[in-house]
């Protein structure tokens, strides 16, 4: 089951885990990985589940993008911390975008790629259980997936 243990953790704890995991992994496949500078803050949620959510978003960015660029941008607004994963080479169409958080849904770009169609659906369930949100947009051939965390 998708249980979450709500507590408080620092944004830097979350980002350090993500950077440690992906710096080497992405350099091995020659993907440029960039994490923007950010102001540390306390977040409300489940640290391990938050790591899972970001890993899932990044794995999708690698699988369905062109593998050239993964950028993570961080911003704060309205008492929330936004973490946006941007990837180049988005092959999803605008008409498919509204469906990416549905269970078992897979885009036309997923034909030769392994997956269950559950990743982003689970991410959304987890973000909602932590009081947050997740959304996506396509701009100029880039895919942006943003996880919204509640600040303490």
At which residue positions do the language-model features occur?
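Short beta-strand/loop element within the Bergerat-fold HATPase_c
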Residues: 69-79
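Short conserved segment of the HATPase_c
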Residues: 92-105
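A conserved beta-strand-to-alpha-helix junction within the catalytic ATP-binding
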Residues: 5-20
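Short alpha-helical Gxxx[C/S/T] motif in the catalytic ATP-binding
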Residues: 119, 123
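Short helix-loop "hinge" at the ATP-lid/N-box region of the Bergerat-fold HATPase_c
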Residues: 61-62
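Conserved catalytic submotifs in the C-terminal HATPase_c
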Residues: 5-8, 32-42
